[in-house]
Amino acid sequence: MKIAIVNDMPMAIEALRRALAFEPAHQIIWVASNGADAVQRCVEQTPDLILMDLIMPVMDGVEATRRIMAETPCAIVIVTVDHEQNMRRVFEAMGHGALDVVDTPAIGGPNPKEAAAPLLRKILNIDWLIGQRVGLERVAATPRAAPSRRDRLVAIGSSAGGPAALEILLKALPVSFPAAIVLVQHVDQVFAAGMADWLSSASGLPVRLAREGETPQPGVVLLAGTNHHIRLLKDGTLAYTAEPVNEVYRPSIDVFFESVTRYWSGEAIGVLLTGMGRDGAQGLKAMRERGFLTIAQDQASSAVYGMPKAAAAIDAAVEIRPLPAIAPRLIEVFTQ
């Protein structure tokens, strides 16, 4: 994989060089010391992946991500030394299309290979996404009971560009929205709590991490919060699970959508937002085949038109809508 580093700190650059050296297939093709330089270098030689710092002179990582995704799109991972202090910037960058976030590896310790492992795992996942090799082993659906108007669920999946898309969608929903909402966003568990807090503040709706064993209810938005998959169980409660182990991204949108298809006994809507790869497409199709309304974000409003495109290609979406039109449609369906 051809990788570029955008960072103004020599120690951080050296840490990334050493971490990448553990995987001979990775080639560093250039290094930029600020976002403006990176934007220009991408025009000259677009990499497969950029490891992007947040705080830099001239142009920061948020603006550089926005410019690169608009002009010469490629995979971007935010690499930061202090994600807690920079949480808002992290999700702004992800809103512009950054795929993931990872701490700068601390390679000066006794086990540098272990320190490099989180970064290398994320790069491996992104390599799979770029190749669109993500798949799902389909499972037979359990016939659902007749819908109850009291049991309503919106299942939403998103990846690259998702934080900003989720902010827009949730902000357009009333606090009195009468359906439970569960979000599955591709984000590491280290950043999940911060994302929930950020979404809650930005949208005006209460957003928190989903807890093992709880039942989705109207009035609170639940975000999958670990590096395990989240599933709906037969009794209507949520559970985290390591299976299936072959899913590239954890939590998997497909896994959650499939569980809704099998076990949700009321009304449900599946929504697939911006993101790279195919995760969510097969699960959305399963929801459609069980009679649920399914919505995919359109190309024009998607930061990365990968997952919704995959859904459209297999006829998984009943409706394809621009992002600003999705919340009004949810309100229309569930307030009739």
Swiss-Prot record:
InterPro entries the record matches: CheB-like, CheB_C, CheY-like_superfamily, Sig_transdc_resp-reg_Me-estase, Sig_transdc_resp-reg_receiver
Enzyme category, top tier: hydrolase
EC number: 3.1.1.61, 3.5.1.44
GO MF annotation, one: protein-glutamine glutaminase activity
Localization of this protein: Cytoplasm
Catalytic activity of the protein: [protein]-L-glutamate 5-O-methyl ester + H2O = L-glutamyl-[protein] + methanol + H(+); L-glutaminyl-[protein] + H2O = L-glutamyl-[protein] + NH4(+)
Positions bearing 4-aspartylphosphate: 53
Active site location: 159, 186, 279
Domain spans labelled CheB-type methylesterase: 147-336
Domain Response regulatory: start-end pairs: 2-119
Matches recorded under SMART domains: REC (SM00448)
Keyword Iron-sulfur: no
Family: Belongs to the CheB family.
Protein name: Protein-glutamate methylesterase/protein-glutamine glutaminase 2
Natural source organism: Pseudomonas syringae pv. syringae (strain B728a)
Gene: cheB2
